Amino acid sequence: MVLDSGAQAYDQAPPSPPTSPPSLRHRLKPSDRDGPPLYPWSQSLALPLALAVPPALQPQPEQQPFSQMLLGHRGHMRRSESTYSVNSTGRRGRGTLGRPPPGRGRNPGGGTLRPAASLPHIAKTQRDAGHIASKSPCMLVALRPTNMDRERDKFFQSHYTYNPQFEYQEPMPTAVLEKYCEASGQFIHQAVGIIEAVLEKFGTYEHFEAATGGQLLTKCQIWSIVRKYMQKEGCAGEVVVQLSEDLLSQAVMMVENSRPTLAINLTGARQYWLEGMLRHEIGTHYLRGVNNARQPWHNAEGRLRYGLRPANPTEEGLASLHSVLFRKQPFLWRAALLYYTIHRAARMSFRQLFQDLERYVQDADVRWEYCVRAKRGQTDTSLPGCFSKDQVYLDGIVRILRHRQTIDFPLLTSLGKVSYEDVDHLRPHGVLDNTRVPHFMQDLARYRQQLEHIMATNRLDEAELGRLLPD
């Protein structure tokens, strides 16, 4: 592991302190289809940088997200959807997320004070994302409204009575919009049950976060926890770690200077949540991606040849479970609220959805972002409609928990980016030598006990899951 608390912008080294407040930027991984993330960097680079050249003196290649790094014939590493957030200082290739409306969650310098983990995340537009997006805009970039800031101002000035009229860059990904135009209600009872369990115990989400997240960590404490975690996973020297105060997510993975890089949000690094984030990003996505590169189904042709199912529900479900693994209160709040929001968006206008969410989320800025997330792709939001892709988190969680007693979790990790449903089929064909299983799966009995604890905490009923997902 390489620890880097210096330059936090990834295009070039920081100049003298900016005279204007730093802008914020966040982007989702461009995964509009399920598929295998690959190991996207030369293995010769998976070493500690004992003598690192200062960033200002290095040639600056185009910064790419972890999911887009190309490596010859191997194609690109594509992980299931999650957030790539990069802080910015207004230099080339940087965009401006936009100014949130006055009120909670703003500091005088223009940065957000809202807890990073409480928000969904919206990709930057082609206009905002600059050179990278203009070359090949991903699906999630294309679905971010280009006029979102202006419509947000109108919405808040109307006291939440205006339905935003969104505009998008062209061409719109119509095939993707058609694929995700219908919301599922299969697990709506579970979603509502999880949300209400949190509010019943803590009153509000903000109280839940304060009670279960623990204190914010100092840089030294973060370095110590990250260093120990990387050693546990055998990843020391493979991943560059950087700290930032400008990320909107808890953490982000990307490839910078041909090295896998994990950026951690200083303002969201809480005592009891940091290791969960590391289990999500490193212990799940990273290790499964490394293992996947060794398998004969590491590319699209191989997946077709072996008849593999989509990996995304399993990938995101597993990562989401690992995020809360070993917590005293392992509530699946975010996955449940995203599922609920999309389910309601399919039946409501934007303003109706915003008002409906008030029963669960008081912060207007947070509600706005959940609503925009669910209404992506719509122009006239006075009409019912949704973009349902984010339901994959809870969907994957519930399916894994339903079959938790029969899934071979170490093998599921070793086989790479595959669905739990394909494990038995792939067992004879997997390349298992030198694959990597996260340390928290070594004691499988304890791991399974934690899954039972997650079931109980979130009030998930075994018999009901059996009826919803029969064998």
From Swiss-Prot:
It comes from the Eukaryota. Changing K219E: Reduced binding to microtubules. The active site is at E281 (nucleophile). It holds the Pfam family MATCAP. Residues 1-40, 76-116 are annotated as: Disordered. Its EC number is 3.4.17.17. The keyword Chaperone does not apply. The keyword Transmembrane does not apply. It is an enzyme of class 3 (hydrolase). GO terms for cellular component: cytoplasm; microtubule. Tyrosine carboxypeptidase that removes the C-terminal tyrosine residue of alpha-tubulin, thereby regulating microtubule dynamics and function. Also able to remove the C-terminal phenylalanine residue of alpha-tubulin TUBA8. Recognizes adjacent tubulin dimers along the same protofilament. Belongs to the peptidase MATCAP family. This is Microtubule-associated tyrosine carboxypeptidase 1. It comes from Homo sapiens. The lineage of its organism: Eukaryota, Metazoa, Chordata, Craniata, Vertebrata.
